[in-house]
């Protein structure tokens, strides 16, 4: 069906009270998806791909979710409801699946539909930081830089990408979907992904690069270590 310009899939997803919730937007913005609910879950790519191979009659069926560096710790799902946009056209898919009774799953799907609510605007982000901690700290970070430059100077490496983790605490709960929306506005030309496991736990990010893409036996990767937008204030950017 044709899209209305005012429709924001992420806002609609965040308005629902069913979990898990998953959002994804392709880097150039041509493809976008939201999925809601899980009929069945998979902990690895192998499990998910095996399931898809068992249902070749549904070539457009997709499994969504998150991979992990540990192949057995993924969080992949066959969604109850999938909205997918390609260009200016969108499709809405409600999936029924059961290993024992499709009739019973149809009843559950009907109950699921009854829980859906209208779209609500996402709230703005007004956060007050109460604690900020970096790993490594400034001393450790300086040591890493010195080690990296020394290693490059000695010819052992041509390039190295340093990274650190930051733990932020706020005075009030963070609306993860609103943070995803803010990142989407700021970090252009990125892959945006968001998964809410429940009302209090979510995983999200905006990456300018794709580590890899595999289609059948073809594996494609690209040069990594790009950048995303930094704070416009030079002092804040320096601190970050």
Where are these regions (language model features)?
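Short Lys/Arg-enriched alpha/beta "domain-start" segment
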Residues: 1-55, 167-170
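A short, Trp-centered hydrophobic/proline-enriched beta-strand micro-motif
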Residues: 18-26, 62-64, 158-160, 190-195
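Non-catalytic accessory segments adjacent to catalytic cores
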Residues: 45-168
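Short, flexible loop/turn elements at secondary-structure junctions
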Residues: 67-68, 166, 197-199, 210, ...
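Cytosolic ligand/metal-binding cores
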Residues: 87-116, 206, 211-240
């Amino acid at each position: 069906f044709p899209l209305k310009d005012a429709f924001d899939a992420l806002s609609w997803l965040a308005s629902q009270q069913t979990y898990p919730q998953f959002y994804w937007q392709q880097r150039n913005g041509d493809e976008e998806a939201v999925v809601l609910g899980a009929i069945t879950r998979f902990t690895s790519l192998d499990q998910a791909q095996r399931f898809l191979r068992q249902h070749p009659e549904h070539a457009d069926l997709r499994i969504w979710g998150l991979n992990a560096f540990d192949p057995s710790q993924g969080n992949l799902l066959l969604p109850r409801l999938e909205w997918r946009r390609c260009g200016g056209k969108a499709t809405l898919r409600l999936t029924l699946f059961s290993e024992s009774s499709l009739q019973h799953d149809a009843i559950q799907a009907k109950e699921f539909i009854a829980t859906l609510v209208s779209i609500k605007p996402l709230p703005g982000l007004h956060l007050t930081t109460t604690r900020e901690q970096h790993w490594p700290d400034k001393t450790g970070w300086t040591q890493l830089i010195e080690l990296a430059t020394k290693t490059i100077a000695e010819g052992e490496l041509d390039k190295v990408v340093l990274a650190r983790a930051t733990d932020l605490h706020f005075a009030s709960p963070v609306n993860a979907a609103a943070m995803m929306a803010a990142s989407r506005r700021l970090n252009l030309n990125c892959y945006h992904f968001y998964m809410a496991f429940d009302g209090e736990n979510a995983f999200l990010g905006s990456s300018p690069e794709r580590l890899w893409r595999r289609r059948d036996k073809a594996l494609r990767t690209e040069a990594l270590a790009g950048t995303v937008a930094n704070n416009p204030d030079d002092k804040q950017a320096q601190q970050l």
